[in-house]
């Protein structure tokens, strides 16, 4: 687990999942607000 290669891959995976999580939260917030204000 202390290898630099697997470390780099883990960091990239975490960053990608973080971006997807933020995108999902953003989409849910837009849908939620449009549902409320309708």
Curated annotation (Swiss-Prot):
<dbReference type="GO" id="GO:0015979">
    <property type="term" value="P:photosynthesis"/>
</dbReference>
<keyword id="KW-0812">Transmembrane</keyword>
<keyword id="KW-0604">Photosystem II</keyword>
<keyword id="KW-0602">Photosynthesis</keyword>
<keyword id="KW-0150">Chloroplast</keyword>
<dbReference type="GO" id="GO:0009539">
    <property type="term" value="C:photosystem II reaction center"/>
</dbReference>
<dbReference type="GO" id="GO:0009535">
    <property type="term" value="C:chloroplast thylakoid membrane"/>
</dbReference>
<keyword id="KW-1133">Transmembrane helix</keyword>
<keyword id="KW-0472">Membrane</keyword>
<dbReference type="InterPro" id="IPR003372">
    <property type="entry name" value="PSII_PsbL"/>
</dbReference>
<keyword id="KW-0793">Thylakoid</keyword>
<comment type="subunit">
    <text>PSII is composed of 1 copy each of membrane proteins PsbA, PsbB, PsbC, PsbD, PsbE, PsbF, PsbH, PsbI, PsbJ, PsbK, PsbL, PsbM, PsbT, PsbY, PsbZ, Psb30/Ycf12, at least 3 peripheral proteins of the oxygen-evolving complex and a large number of cofactors. It forms dimeric complexes.</text>
</comment>
<dbReference type="Pfam" id="PF02419">
    <property type="entry name" value="PsbL"/>
</dbReference>
<dbReference type="InterPro" id="IPR037266">
    <property type="entry name" value="PSII_PsbL_sf"/>
</dbReference>
<keyword id="KW-0674">Reaction center</keyword>
<comment type="similarity">
    <text>Belongs to the PsbL family.</text>
</comment>
<protein>
    <recommendedName>
        <fullName>Photosystem II reaction center protein L</fullName>
    </recommendedName>
</protein>
<feature type="transmembrane region" description="Helical">
    <location>
        <begin position="17"/>
        <end position="37"/>
    </location>
</feature>
<keyword id="KW-0934">Plastid</keyword>
<comment type="function">
    <text>One of the components of the core complex of photosystem II (PSII). PSII is a light-driven water:plastoquinone oxidoreductase that uses light energy to abstract electrons from H(2)O, generating O(2) and a proton gradient subsequently used for ATP formation. It consists of a core antenna complex that captures photons, and an electron transfer chain that converts photonic excitation into a charge separation. This subunit is found at the monomer-monomer interface and is required for correct PSII assembly and/or dimerization.</text>
</comment>
């Amino acid at each position: 687990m202390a290898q630099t290669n697997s470390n780099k891959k883990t960091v990239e995976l975490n960053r990608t999942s973080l971006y997807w999580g933020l995108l999902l939260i953003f989409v849910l917030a837009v849908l939620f607000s449009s549902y409320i204000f309708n």
